[in-house]
């Protein structure tokens, strides 16, 4: 039965993914083409509809104990933070948290790569919105020449396993990439730099990214292809227009939640123990007359300490 549920889950996601692919212009980055933007009147109607739908769904998420993790990745100045702000206006503050993932601290760098992101995953029945996540850190390391070859492949494999562990354990994982072209990015940066109260938002890396737009696009495209899975696919969002961006995000978010709720058991839980469990004897069955010599004790203790060190 568990295997059937898992197969059904994958089938539902693949079907939903395929049906909506054309609707949202869903391809990998370099071959991506924008979806068709509705006219002004239709936009207004659809925005109102999807905002209300998300508001209604939050109680169902709570009721069904569905954890929802939403990642916003994309180009600098694409509006990731502001879009999160628009989405959470439709959700009770008790049911979500927002995390902005800046550069890792020295303490975090001494831990496994995904450690700081694992701390942010939501509890049952709640949302977590990540303003940039493990994609941004990975591609920055690639662009800086710090991650390549086998090390890159191991990083990708760890990310795929992590995302699969989340979905196998009942999480809905939605990954958005906010797409704008080089000229639009440059225009937005110039606007931010022209005002004293916003120019701090443009970093040296942001400027470098615009100057090396094509190189960055190649790295982004490779990463997205490597981490695109049926259970946690990438959704490329046309981020040129604010209202159109919001509508795309809300439609994908609400329809993703609908699918997850319809298939309440998202997947088979992961087995936590990979070793066989031995039956423990009752206390009354433990012999109390056994002894061990001092030399044998030291020898066995040393063996076990060495084994533990391995």
Predicted regions and their residues:
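Glycine-rich phosphate-binding loop of ATP-dependent small-molecule kinases
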Residues: 14-310
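Cationic, low-complexity basic patches in intrinsically disordered or flexible, solvent-exposed regions
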Residues: 4-8
């Amino acid at each position: 039965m568990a295997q059937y549920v898992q197969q059904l889950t994958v089938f539902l996601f693949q079907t939903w993914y395929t049906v909506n692919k054309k609707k949202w212009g869903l391809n990998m980055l370099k071959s991506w083409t924008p979806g068709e933007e509705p006219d002004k009147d239709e936009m207004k109607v659809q925005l109102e509809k999807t905002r209300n739908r998300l508001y209604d769904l939050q109680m169902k998420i709570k009721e069904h104990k569905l954890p929802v993790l939403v990642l916003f990745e994309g180009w600098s100045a694409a509006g990731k933070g502001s879009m999160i702000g628009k989405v959470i206006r439709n959700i009770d503050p008790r049911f979500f948290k927002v995390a902005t993932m800046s550069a890792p601290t020295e303490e975090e760098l001494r831990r496994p790569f995904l450690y700081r992101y694992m701390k942010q995953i939501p509890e049952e029945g709640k949302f977590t919105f990540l303003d940039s996540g493990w994609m941004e850190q990975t591609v920055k390391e690639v662009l800086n020449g710090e991650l390549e070859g086998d090390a890159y492949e191991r990083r990708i494999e760890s990310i795929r396993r992590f995302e699969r562990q989340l979905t196998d354990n009942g999480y809905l994982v939605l990954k958005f990439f906010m797409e704008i072209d080089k000229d639009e990015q440059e225009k937005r940066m110039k606007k931010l730099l022209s005002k004293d109260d916003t120019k701090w938002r443009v970093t040296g890396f942001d400027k470098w990214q615009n100057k090396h737009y094509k190189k960055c696009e190649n790295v982004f495209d490779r990463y997205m292809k490597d981490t695109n899975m049926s259970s946690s696919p990438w959704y490329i969002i046309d981020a040129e227009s604010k209202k159109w961006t919001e509508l795309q995000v809300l439609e994908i978010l609400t329809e993703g939640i609908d699918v997850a709720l319809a298939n309440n058991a998202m997947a088979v839980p992961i087995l936590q123990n990979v070793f066989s469990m031995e039956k423990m004897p009752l206390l009354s069955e433990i012999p109390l007359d056994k002894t061990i010599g001092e030399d044998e004790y030291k020898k066995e203790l040393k063996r076990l300490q060495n084994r533990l060190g391995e």
